Curated annotation (Swiss-Prot):
InterPro entries according to UniProt: Chaperonin_Cpn60_CS (IPR018370), Cpn60/GroEL (IPR001844), Cpn60/GroEL/TCP-1 (IPR002423), GroEL-like_apical_dom_sf (IPR027409), GROEL-like_equatorial_sf (IPR027413), TCP-1-like_intermed_sf (IPR027410)
Superkingdom of source: Eukaryota
Name assigned to this protein: RuBisCO large subunit-binding protein subunit alpha, chloroplastic
Induction: By heat shock.
Localisation per UniProt entry: Plastid, Chloroplast
Gene Ontology molecular-function annotations: ATP binding; ATP-dependent protein folding chaperone
UniProt key word Lyase: no
Subunit structure: Oligomer of probably six alpha and six beta subunits.
Ranges of biased composition (kind: Polar residues): 1-17
Keywords: ATP-binding, Chaperone, Chloroplast, Nucleotide-binding, Plastid, Stress response, Transit peptide
Source organism per UniProt: Chlamydomonas reinhardtii (Chlamydomonas smithii)
The protein's role, per its UniProt record: This protein binds RuBisCO small and large subunits and is implicated in the assembly of the enzyme oligomer.
Gene Ontology terms: biological process: protein refolding
Length: 580
């Protein structure tokens, strides 16, 4: 392929248009510049934002709990999708009113932050945020100082997070893992068993990957591979926009400890890989400047499927980790100490990964079957080094490397009879996987909204430590809001939620409402449990967004224009320029 066929990145500059500053005579006005804006102030802005927030929370709220309902999503092509996953529902929501849509985006941000941090709990976080915003706006409308109320929210949340950590129990054995996974997957015991089986095979520090099966059966396979604690350098490399992932099959892998910043460093190897029509993963000390721009441009233009990540670790440990990666993928480590240069690299020096998945902070490599013997030899070498070292630090790091190499990757191959069932099942397994790792990390608490409800009972005592009356309002808002998830779970199960809440108040922390069997019981003993990390992140993110809403005084959005279609016609079918 000629060098000219690879597009070179270039710097672009953008000018900022001058705007005349409008007089703020009215409380609602339109600024006309390159694009007209609508600005809405005070109560109207908060009312319309809240309307958008309520629509999202109502849509995802119906799925909460073991007896939560389904939601039908219209697809651009094919049959509608029937799902019970809050993440997918919130992603699909776009509202016609631009201010309401801004509110919808705010509560979607709560869910997104919670999902990014803990991998689950998006529906609970959305419900919590809606309640805090509802009660908070009531207080502000009645004349409370929003800054003081926000301080009360923040202080109460900080206190409750500390109490939550005190009540969290460590995960003990297979049963706890199975229960966490089952609950997160919508009380699907088969998925719970599957996640427990997978972790039995690779350990709690292992890696789980989810793929589509070629049959209708769902199976767990353990394959050679490893996870790297580094993500993509640029989000422009993303191939799966919904999940913000880079996903490639049969990917070539370049492994080096050198910095790549000049075009000349990478053009030769890019041309060779382009001829193979194969994707490329670059693992280097850094990729920046013209080199990064060139990769991004060629990825966006469809010339080459490529992704770049920074090498994990530091100093000598970085070299060792890169050697591990090279062995897993069958690559030759292009080391600067040996006088090797990236610009002289050839295809034969690249490794191969059967599957590569890159997130914003992790990369999973599933190795080609041919690498198995080399990986076993590397593990044996590391075990020998481990036996000979006296350093506590070296012992820890060598053990970590051995675990990464020997654990492998548990691949859950998901099968189903229909496309709709397949997508729903994959979403449930993804939730179960994320919840399980969150539980292993920070422990478990009673589920069913019970942990949040019992935390609300601790607020009155904490409120007595506050001296500002409006900060106490913030504490009251948190207290009332924390009871909403339990109430909604009961409502979705067909019973009176407020009655259940009153029955649980004053009970021990472990006692809650098991909606699956309509019974108040010890939820830890019953296996109805949630990861403490999910509960913590849901609470903190809800308080954060509620504080933003309470201190919002104006909203500026794009003013909608009639969309035009070819032939000078508007979307309504009338000729453009006509008054309708």
């Amino acid at each position: 392929m000629a060098q000219s066929q690879l597009a070179k990145g270039s710097r672009q500059t953008t000018g900022r248009p001058f705007q005349n500053k409008p007089a703020r005579a009215a409380r609602r006005l339109v600024i006309r510049a390159a694009d007209a804006k609508e600005i809405v102030f005070d109560q109207e802005s908060r009312r319309r934002l809240q309307a958008g927030i309520n629509k999202v929370a109502d849509a995802v709220g119906v799925t909460l709990g073991p007896r939560g309902r389904n939601v039908v999503l219209e697809q651009k092509f094919g049959v509608p999708q029937v799902i019970n996953d809050g993440v997918s529902i919130r992603r699909a929501i776009e509202l016609k009113d631009p201010v309401e849509n801004a509110g919808a985006q705010l509560i979607k941000e709560v869910a997104g932050r919670t999902n990014d941090a803990a991998g689950d709990g998006t529906t609970t976080a959305s419900v919590l945020a809606r309640e805090m915003i509802h009660y908070g706006l009531q207080s502000v409308t009645a004349g409370a100082n929003p800054i003081a109320v926000k301080r009360g929210l923040d202080k109460t949340a900080e206190y409750l997070v500390a109490k939550l950590k005190e009540h969290a129990k460590p995960v003990k054995g297979r049963d706890d893992i199975k229960n966490v996974a089952s609950i997160s997957a919508g009380n699907d015991n088969a998925i719970g068993e599957m996640i427990a089986d997978a972790l039995d095979k690779v350990g709690s520090n292992g890696v789980l990957s989810i793929e589509t099966s070629n049959s209708t059966e769902t199976v767990v396979e353990v394959q050679e591979g490893m996870e790297i604690d580094r993500g993509y350098i640029s989000p422009q490399f993303v191939t799966n926009q919904e999940r913000l992932l880079v996903e490639y099959d049969n990917c070539r892998v370049l492994v080096t400890d050198q910095k790549i910043d000049a075009i000349r460093d990478i053009i030769p190897i890019l041309e060779q890989v382009t001829r193979l029509n194969a994707p490329l993963l670059i693992i280097a000390e850094d990729v920046s400047g013209e080199a990064l721009a060139t990769l991004v441009v060629n990825k966006l233009r469809g010339v080459l499927n490529v992704c770049a990540i920074k090498a994990p670790g530091f100093g000598e440990r970085r070299k060792s980790l890169l050697q591990d990666i090279a062995i897993v993928t069958g690559a030759e480590f292009i080391a600067k100490d040996l006088g090797m240069k990236v610009e002289q690299a050839v295809v034969e020096q690249l490794g191969v990964a059967r599957k590569v998945t890159v997130a914003n902070n992790t990369t999973t490599l599933i190795a080609d079957a041919a690498s198995k013997d080399e990986i076993e030899m590397r593990i044996a070498q590391l075990k020998k080094e481990l036996a000979e070292t006296d350093s506590v630090y070296d012992t820890e790091k060598l053990s970590e490397r051995i675990a990464k190499l020997s654990g492998g990757v548990a691949v859950i191959k998901v099968g189903a009879a229909t496309e709709a069932e397949l997508e729903d099942r994959k979403l449930r397994i993804e939730d179960a996987k994320n919840a399980t790792f969150a539980a292993v990390e920070e422990g478990i608490v009673p589920g069913g909204g019970a942990a949040l409800l019992h935390l609300s009972e601790l607020v009155p005592a904490f409120k007595e430590t506050l001296t500002d009356a409006e900060e106490k309002l913030g504490a009251d808002i948190v207290m009332k809001s924390l009871r909403a998830p339990c109430r909604l779970i009961a409502d979705n199960a067909g019973v009176e939620g407020e009655v259940i809440v009153q029955r649980l108040l004053g009970k021990p922390f472990e006692v809650g409402y098991n909606a699956m069997i309509d019974k108040v019981e010890n939820l830890l003993d019953a296996g109805v449990i949630d990861p403490a990390k999910v509960t913590r992140n849901g609470l903190l993110n809800s308080v954060s967004i509620a504080g933003i809403m309470l201190t919002t005084q104006a909203v500026m959005v794009e003013k909608h224009k009639p969309s035009e279609i070819p032939g000078g016609m508007t979307a309504s079918g009338m000729p453009s320029g006509m008054t309708i």
